Amino acid sequence: MEFTFLGTSAGTPTRSRNVTGLALCLSGPKPWYLVDCGEGTQHQLMRTRYSVMQLRAMFITHIHGDHIFGLPGLLTSASMLGRTEPLDIIAPPQVRRFIDAVIENSDSSLSYPLNFINSEAPDFYWQDDHLGVTNVALSHRVPCRAYVFTERNLERQLQKEKLVADGIEPGPQWGDLQKGKDVLLDDGRLLRSNDYTHIPRTARKIIVGGDNDTPELLKDACQGTHVLIHEATYTQDVADRVGPWPQHSSAQQVARFAQATKLPNLVLTHFSSRYQSAPGGSPHINQLAAEALQHYKGQLFLARDFDTYRLEKDFQLHKVDHN
């Protein structure tokens, strides 16, 4: 599984950071999935290997502008490029009204259908051939969700000795069983894939959080999770000065939660625009990492725009470079 940060700034962009967007794929950029779509996301995508033509679904965490203002431009650009495949948009109900209003009032149209799915439905679950997705309600000024991505249809290994012992010679049936399909033989026997195959590894699981001032809400979902991507808008001293109203997390809060939950990998993002990246800048973005490292002993990453990370099948997380 790979994910690329298209924007890591909170609220407003900076010279080096766009507002929120994240591209996720399983084994390559076809298909891929987008989590949030702040202003300028489609322009950020032009600097990556992802194409709007292969976008399978969008997952919107909440309705604040730094997470949705890029939607109309991206959707209409896909139409101008000739997209015809339907696109799933998993989002709060207001997002549909927002998109409809912009399309109607800008004399725009789409060449493909949008399938809106209410992210706030109590029984929410989405899946395709590659991923199953649930979500968790967070604590923010408006309803907000974290999305839990778990891979599906893991590769199976044939139990060849058992097949041979049961008189089933190598042939097309073996391939079907390995694909998870049950097979009906000419002699009337039904071969069940689960009886002749096994899955040798555990599914990879990633959580992508929206805005949230209470990381503990993710405690249950984090069981068995290999990567948590969570906002760290402030250092704790800034959070104390700002007060509770914005309902964001500090690096300290998230790090303490990740340590208590024994998360192996933590990636922080959504940094206040006050934090600078240039050498000598103050306050500097490295202060967020320094604060988190005081409380978290797992593998910590501070996301930057266009950083790409790969979660391997052995659950090791590392940065990759596709250039």
Swiss-Prot record:
Cofactors (names): Zn(2+)
Keywords: Endonuclease, Hydrolase, Metal-binding, Nuclease, tRNA processing, Zinc
Keyword hit for NAD: no
Molecular function via GO: 3'-tRNA processing endoribonuclease activity; zinc ion binding
Catalytic activity from the UniProt record: Endonucleolytic cleavage of RNA, removing extra 3' nucleotides from tRNA precursor, generating 3' termini of tRNAs. A 3'-hydroxy group is left at the tRNA terminus and a 5'-phosphoryl group is left at the trailer molecule
Gene3D superfamilies in the record: Ribonuclease Z/Hydroxyacylglutathione hydrolase-like
E.C. no: 3.1.26.11
Cofactor binding summary note: Binds 2 Zn(2+) ions.
Binding site for Zn(2+) 2: D66, H67, D211, H270
Superkingdom: Bacteria
Active-site residues, as the UniProt record annotates them: D66 (proton acceptor)
SUPFAM superfamilies attached to this UniProt entry: Metallo-hydrolase/oxidoreductase
Residues that hold Zn(2+) 1 according to the record: H62, H64, H140, D211
HAMAP family listed in its UniProt record: RNase_Z_BN
PANTHER family named in the record: ZINC PHOSPHODIESTERASE ELAC PROTEIN 1
Family assignment from sequence similarity: Belongs to the RNase Z family.
Subunit structure and binding partners: Homodimer.
Protein name: Ribonuclease Z
Organism of provenance: Marinobacter nauticus (strain ATCC 700491 / DSM 11845 / VT8) (Marinobacter aquaeolei)
Gene name per UniProt: rnz
